[in-house]
Every structure is written in C-alpha cells, then in structure tokens.
C-alpha cells in the first residue's frame, strides 16, 4: 500500500463506505455523506429537514434531558416525552404513601396541576461548529510536550468562551458554549446550548406499566415495558430560560415532532437522534481485558451484594420499597450492563477482534516506515499492566464503599465550620450547624433508612475486607481487626451508636450543644474521612497513568483513520447529539430461535404474575385488554402493540430518544438494548444488536385509556 498523508478528517471520512449497514453514532455534520444511503434504506425526508445548520430542523425538537437522557418535544406548548426511568427520580420525589405516584401513576388534568422539579434541566443544541483548526492553533502556543490540555474540559471551555466573545452569556440569556474533543483529540466541535430549568412533571404511568418486567426483563428482548413519562418546559414570557416561577409560561419551541399511528413492519426504515453517553470503539485488546476483568467484574460483584440486601428489605416493607426504588433501579442499570458487556466480550470474540485491528495497524505502520503506531499500542499495554493493582483497589473502594454505603457520605466539617464552632459567635455557630445539617440531610433524607444502610454496610465491608490487604485499608477500617476482632457487624453498630449522624435524634442532641471535640472523634466522620483520603490517594496515584494512555490513544486513533481512510469511522460517544439509522427487525440469538420485531399487550398478560411485583398488571390496563378497547391504537390485526426493536446503534444516554419513521414522524421512544448486543459499546454486532423501543401507539393508549388525560392527546399532532 502506498504511503498516504492523513487527509483532513471530515474529508477523509467522506470517502468511506460503511462497514456494517446500520452501524454508527454519527455526528450531525456527517449527515451529508450518510444521506444517500439513508435514502436507499427508505428515508423520505429532505436532508435539511433533519439537520439544518442555518435554520430549524428536527434536530431542534431533541433535548438532552436531565444531563443523561434524551427527550423530544411533541407539542407547540413545550411538551416533552422521555422514558419513565429517566423521569423516575422526579416521580419518586413527588411520591408519598398518600400520593404514591410511583405505584399509581400521575396525570396532571390541568396545566396548573403540573409539578415543578428541583435540579432538573433540558438542553437544546442551537448550533454546532467545527473548530478543529482554531483549537489546534491555540494548542501550538503550549510549550509543554506532555500537556494534556488538548483533552482538558477546563482548557477547552476557556477556548469556547474566548471564541464566543466577551459577555456572550450576558448578551444571550440561557445560552452557553462548550467545545468537545472527538477521535481522541483529532477533531473539535463547539456546541451552543440553550438550557431550561423550569421543567414540570405532566404525566407518568404506574410503575407496573412504566417499569413492567423491572430487573428480570432489563436488557432483554422480547420486552413489554411502557417506559415513558411526560414533562413540560416552561420559560419566561419572552421564551427565555428562567428559574421556576408561577409567571412562567409553556415554551413555544422552534420545532416539535408529529406522532404517527401508522405503526411498524419488519424491515421498515427507523432513525434515532439522541445523546449517547460513552462507548469504547477504539479500545485495544489490553484495554478490553482491563475493562472486563477489573471494572466490570468488580462492579458486578459489589452491586450484586448491595442489591441483594436492598431487595430483601424492599420486599419486606412497602415504605422501604418507595424509599429505595430509585436507588435500586439506578444501581441495577449499570450492573446489568456490565454483565451483558462481559458476556459479549466472552462469546462474540470482541477482544480477539480488537487484537486483530491493532495488529493490522502495526503491520500497516511498519510498511509505511511509521513505528509510532506500534509504539502507541505498546505504551497502552504497558501502562494498563502497571496500573492494574491500583485500579483494582480504586474500583473496590468506589463500588464497595463510596457508591455502596450511604453513610460513607457523612458530612466532614470544613475548616471554616470548625472555627465557627470553636468561637463565641452564636450566629456563626448556628450557620455552621445548619450547613452541616444540610449536608447530612443529602443522604439521610426522606428516602434513607439507617437500618437498611447498616445491613448494606455489613455485607459490603465484609466483601471489601476479603479483597483488600490490611496495609491498603482506609485507616478507620483497620479497627475492624484491631478493635473488633474482625466482627464487621459490631464495627458498624458501634459507628451508628456513637456518631452524631447515627440518627436525626442524635444529630439534634449534638446541634443543641455543639462540640468540635465530639465531631473530631465522631466515628462516622472518621470513617468517611479515611475512606475519602484513601480514595483520593488512589485517584492521585492513578492519574499519572492516564496521560500516557490518552496520548497513545490519540496516536492510535489517528493511525486507524489514516489506514482506513476509505472506510467509515465515527467518534466514540461523549453525550453529544448524534443520529443513527437502520431497520425495524427481529433477530436470531441462537440456533433455531427467532425473536420477532414487535411485542403486544398479549405478552403483558402472558407474563402477568400478581405475586411478583415486577409483573403485576395495572387493573385499568387489564380492563382495557379484556374489553379489547384499543381504538385507533391497535395494529392492522386488531392487536395492541407495546414495543419493537430495530438495528439502530445506541447506548446509555439514548434513553428517551425519539425513534422516527421514514417521514420523520415519531413512532417510538428508545429505552434499552438487548443482551446480545450490549457489547456494541466496543464493537457493533450486526446480527445481534437491537435497540428496544416502546411503541408510540402504546404510549398514546396508556395516556388515553389508563390516564384518561385527553388534553395531552389534543395537544399533540397525531397523524394516521
């Protein structure tokens, strides 16, 4: 092969052909070179109606929801659809035993009944600009050859602010700018974003619909979950972002989705826009090994222990179930994902494929007289090996204690608070106590049970102590051996008995007569301090290994782009707006088994189990089924569709993403992937990978027949 210069990135990619027909989480700027193929697959829209850098398009109806999901605007009054699991925390926050919206659902029959939410946002992408030349020019001014500024969010934000101009945000209310790196720092894009924070809960089905199948069915196809919730964006009277106010009005958006009742058939065109979070497409073989045997294995083991304790307590007490349902669900999602990824690595040859890819690059580089690609691979391999023990200890403390034990987040008094408590200024002492109380209440809130936390802690610490040698333990944890003869239960009981944070009553007693000395000797504070000291120590010891890997990855990815300039390459997901397209299609997971593309309400009833909370069927939904009262939402055969699957390429962050037909009309909401395709974060698996999508007709049926909320249907533009 003749030696070639690396073409400008977008130009090089424009020459490529797709490796797998439906693979790719494509940048919006890459639409032009994918458009012809999309048309061949069935797309009937104009290119500029999907993405128009100089005007409005369907892109303007897609939002980043609450920092980690996707949503879509479906009315001219700012109505937003997303997944039930994306809105779960907000639904839970409004739930009580008296008004249990998690169990019974919530439907605002008037706009005045819509519920405000704390600390929530939706973000529109106003503009996307290629700033690669600008960033690289600025980077040339950096003299340090080992500088990592080319990937530094802080540095890139400085460049974004500089490029946007002085007082940009002041002149443009609600707007902000951000530069993100792609392909390991070989491409840079600047995003202009508009963020709204007055976002109100409008509707949510009962969890028996929105979470039907729960953890048993998570990552599984066939699926029967009505995973949706409804919110509304509010703005000031000029349409600008504003904090919550009764004077705010529903947002009039630039664009919103029409909703199709046409349904789907096998091989129909399907397309998704959204904000995929993280993928590892450019991992080397050693990085795949590390991800599996350290990161995923530890996450699986420690979360399995924690979730086992939580589930037992939730099933034994309805109040605990309300309090811990969101925590359990959040933990389960990453847990199941790790299991699925490891399964794919083991059974689908992903590690071997990455080995073949890097071997091919090394051989190609040698022919070009370019040893730097081989050097990059060797640098990655060596660094992964060097950091293995530190990384294992880091993941154990993160999954086993930081994420696993709630009281590990006990408030550690600041220097200013300590001084205030030592002084004679009563108001300063009160302010210090109030600040400590606020931090205490962040974990010991209405959704906290000290008894559950104790049981989780005993289980987690027992496992942690088996894995970590005594000399590497956080200092306070060494007391398990030194003072309690290895009795973890006695250690945890002692912490709660003697800590001012052991209960609200204990904290109130302390607050009445605050003592710096008591805080300094508090076992929960000492536990938290020693845990975070060790966590920071491990983090700081691992940091020096990051830079050589990131620099080597930049070279490695540049080599792949140069070598395969005649093939498509898309950047790893990083929570930026992307599109993917494919077909509605079933699949065969193994010999003599085929899963069709569509599930129906018949399957919900087949799975019904009144004695298993995961498969309880809502009585209103059951009545609709028994009457066959499906109306205009039924399919051509008269059955009620629930979900379908498609070959689109998605990952975490795509939850809630709009799924469109060939006309750009909304046909469903993406909410999951199948087990067999979860390894798509590393490598797309064409025969197995499927996005799992709740059918929009099921969403509408539930709003109509279960929620009885006709006003929402009247607000949407529903087409045949």
Swiss-Prot record:
Q: What is its EC number?
A: 3.4.14.-
Q: How does activity depend on pH?
A: Optimum pH is 7.0.
Alphabetically sorted, this entry's keywords are:
Aminopeptidase, Disulfide bond, Hydrolase, Protease, Serine protease, Signal
Which cysteine residues pair off into disulfide bonds?
69-86
The annotated site for Is essential for the Asp/Glu P1 specificity of DPP11 falls at 673
State the compartments where it is located.
Cell surface
- Known InterPro entries for this protein? Pep_S46, Peptidase_S1_PA, Peptidase_S1_PA_chymotrypsin
Signal peptide span: 1-21
Q: What is the effect of changing residue 673 to A?
A: Loss of catalytic activity
Q: Which GO terms describe its biological process?
A: developmental cell growth; peptide catabolic process; proteolysis
Write out the catalytic residues in the record: 85 (charge relay system), 227 (charge relay system), 655 (charge relay system)
Keyword hit for Hydrolase: yes
Mutation effect (residue 655 to A): Loss of catalytic activity
Q: What class of enzyme is it?
A: hydrolase
GO MF annotations in UniProt: dipeptidyl-peptidase activity; peptide binding; serine-type aminopeptidase activity
User: Listed GO cellular component terms?
Assistant: cell surface
Activity regulation behaviour: Enzyme activity is completely blocked by diisopropyl-fluorophosphates, moderately by phenylmethylsulfonyl fluoride (PMSF) and 4-(2-methyl)benzenesulfonyl fluoride, and slightly by pepstatin in vitro.
Q: Please describe the quaternary structure of this protein.
A: Homodimer.
Outline what the protein does.
Catalyzes the removal of dipeptides from the N-terminus of oligopeptides. Shows a strict specificity for acidic residues (Asp or Glu) in the P1 position, and has a hydrophobic residue preference at the P2 position. Preferentially cleaves the synthetic substrate Leu-Asp-methylcoumaryl-7-amide (Leu-Asp-MCA) as compared to Leu-Glu-MCA. Is involved in amino acid metabolism and bacterial growth of asaccharolytic P.gingivalis, that utilizes amino acids from extracellular proteinaceous nutrients as energy and carbon sources.
Q: Which family does it belong to?
A: Belongs to the peptidase S46 family.
Q: What is this protein called?
A: Asp/Glu-specific dipeptidyl-peptidase
**Organism whose genome encodes this protein:** Porphyromonas gingivalis (strain ATCC 33277 / DSM 20709 / CIP 103683 / JCM 12257 / NCTC 11834 / 2561)
- What lineage is on file? Bacteria, Pseudomonadati, Bacteroidota, Bacteroidia, Bacteroidales
């Amino acid at each position: 092969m003749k030696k070639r210069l690396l073409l400008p990135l977008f130009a090089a990619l424009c020459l490529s052909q797709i490796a797998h027909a439906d693979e790719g989480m494509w940048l919006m700027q890459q639409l032009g070179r994918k458009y012809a193929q999309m048309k061949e697959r069935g797309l009937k829209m104009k290119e500029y109606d999907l993405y128009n850098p100089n005007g409005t398009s369907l892109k303007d109806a897609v939002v980043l929801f609450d920092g980690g999901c996707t949503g879509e605007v479906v009315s001219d009054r700012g109505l937003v659809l997303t997944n039930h699991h994306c809105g779960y925390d907000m639904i839970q926050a409004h739930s009580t035993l008296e008004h249990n919206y998690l169990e019974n659902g919530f439907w605002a029959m008037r706009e005045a009944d819509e519920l405000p939410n704390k600390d929530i946002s939706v973000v529109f992408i106003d503009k996307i600009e290629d700033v690669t030349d600008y960033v690289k020019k600025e980077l040339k001014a950096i003299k340090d050859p080992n500088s990592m500024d080319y990937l530094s969010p802080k540095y890139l934000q400085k460049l974004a602010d500089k490029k946007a101009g002085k007082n940009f945000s002041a002149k443009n209310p609600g707007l902000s700018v951000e530069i993100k790196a792609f392909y390991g720092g070989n491409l840079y894009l600047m995003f202009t974003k508009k963020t709204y924070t007055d976002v109100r809960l409008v509707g949510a089905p009962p969890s028996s619909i929105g979470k039907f199948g729960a953890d048993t069915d998570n990552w599984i196809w066939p699926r029967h979950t009505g995973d949706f919730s409804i919110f509304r964006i509010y703005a000031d009277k000029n349409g600008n972002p504003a904090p919550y106010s009764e004077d705010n009005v529903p947002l009039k958006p630039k664009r919103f989705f029409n909703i199709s009742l046409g349904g789907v058939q096998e091989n129909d065109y399907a397309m998704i826009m959204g904000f995929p979070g993280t993928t590892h497409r450019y991992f080397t073989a050693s990085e795949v090994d590390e991800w599996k045997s350290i990161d995923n294995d530890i996450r699986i083991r420690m979360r399995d222990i924690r979730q086992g304790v939580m589930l037992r307590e939730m099933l034994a007490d309805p109040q605990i179930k309300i309090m811990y349902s969101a925590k359990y669900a959040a933990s389960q999602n990453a847990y199941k994902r790790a299991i699925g990824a490891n399964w794919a690595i083991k059974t689908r040859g992903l590690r071997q494929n990455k080995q073949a890819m890097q071997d091919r690059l090394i051989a190609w580089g040698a022919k070009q007289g370019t040893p730097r690609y081989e050097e990059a691979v060797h640098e990655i391999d060596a660094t992964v090996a060097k950091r293995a023990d530190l990384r294992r200890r880091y993941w154990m403390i993160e999954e086993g204690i930081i994420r696993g034990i709630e009281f590990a987040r006990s408030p550690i008094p600041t220097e200013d608070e300590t001084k205030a408590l030592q002084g004679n200024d009563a108001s300063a002492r009160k302010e210090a106590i109030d600040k400590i109380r606020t931090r205490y209440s962040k974990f010991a809130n209405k959704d906290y049970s000290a008894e559950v936390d104790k049981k989780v802690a005993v289980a987690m610490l027992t496992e942690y102590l088996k894995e970590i040698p005594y000399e590497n333990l956080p200092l306070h944890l060494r007391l398990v051996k030194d003072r309690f003869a290895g009795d973890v239960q006695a250690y945890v009981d002692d912490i709660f008995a003697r800590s001012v944070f052991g209960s609200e009553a204990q904290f109130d007693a302390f607050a009445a007569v605050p003592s710096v000395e008591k805080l300094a000797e508090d076992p929960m504070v000492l536990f938290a301090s020693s845990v975070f000291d060790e966590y920071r120590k491990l983090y700081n010891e691992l940091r020096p290994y990051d830079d050589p890997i990131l620099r080597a990855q930049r070279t490695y990815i540049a080599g792949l782009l140069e070598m395969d300039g005649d093939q498509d390459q898309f950047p790893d997901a990083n929570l930026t707006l992307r599109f993917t397209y494919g077909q509605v299609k079933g699949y065969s997971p193994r010999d003599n088994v085929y899963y069709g593309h569509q599930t129906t309400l018949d399957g919900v009833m087949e799975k019904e189990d009144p004695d298993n909370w995961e498969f309880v069927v809502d009585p209103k939904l059951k009545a609709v089924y028994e009457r066959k009262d499906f109306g205009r939402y039924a399919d051509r055969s008269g059955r009620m569709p629930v979900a379908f699957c498609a070959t689109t390429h998605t990952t975490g962050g795509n939850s809630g993403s709009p799924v469109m037909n060939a006309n750009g009309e909304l046909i469903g909401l993406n909410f999951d992937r199948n087990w067999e395709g979860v390894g798509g974060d590393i490598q797309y698996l064409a025969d197995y990978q499927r996005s799992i999508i709740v059918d929009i007709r099921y969403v509408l049926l539930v709003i109509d027949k279960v929620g009885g909320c006709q006003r929402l249907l009247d607000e949407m533009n529903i087409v045949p």
